[in-house]
């Protein structure tokens, strides 16, 4: 079984120290992903390949990818994140057989589309 890992995008500044503390408290591995790695697939990142494959369009939104977490551990993490009063991180995903071959850029684009669609739905219901 793969080690429980959270891939971190744009979560490196001091405002994210509480997130790192939560991850350490839960004994989860952290894998910061740099912009020049956005062209690697999520699986390649999980395997800790160090190649650099930049993309044309970088993104700056914070994003998390949960890899190898059980449902219980994921729920524990999300609860701890809410209690830690972290800055909002609307872009979150679980590594799946479908998205593991996507690049970070592709995942970001898909999560942005989904997030925007959800926000439009919420706005339409009010």
Name the predicted role of every residue range:
Residues 20, 32-35, 54, 59, ...:
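Homeobox/homeodomain signature
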Residues 3-8, 60-66, 77:
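Short, structured motif recognition centered on aromatic/hydrophobic residues
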Residues 38-65:
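Short, intrinsically disordered low-complexity segments
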Residues 6, 17-18, 28-31, 74, ...:
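Helix-rich interaction surfaces within compact, conserved domain-sized segments
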Residues 36-42, 62-63, 94-99, 123-125:
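Short C-terminal domain-edge/linker segments immediately following a structured domain
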Residues 1-47, 122:
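N-terminal, charge-rich interaction modules
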Residues 1-2, 56, 60, 86, ...:
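Generic signal for short, ordered secondary-structure residues
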């Amino acid at each position: 079984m793969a080690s429980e890992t959270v891939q971190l995008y744009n979560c490196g500044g001091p405002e994210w120290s509480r997130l790192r503390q939560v991850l350490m408290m839960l004994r989860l591995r952290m894998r910061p992903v740099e912009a020049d790695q956005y062209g690697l697939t999520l699986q390649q990142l999980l395997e800790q390949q160090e190649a650099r494959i930049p993309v044309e369009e970088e993104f700056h939104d914070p994003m998390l990818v949960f890899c190898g977490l059980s449902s219980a551990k994921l729920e524990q993490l999300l609860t701890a994140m809410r209690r830690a009063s972290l800055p909002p991180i609307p872009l979150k995903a679980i590594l799946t057989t479908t998205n593991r071959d996507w690049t970070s850029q592709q995942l970001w684009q898909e999560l942005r589309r989904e997030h925007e669609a959800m926000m439009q739905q919420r706005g339409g219901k009010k």
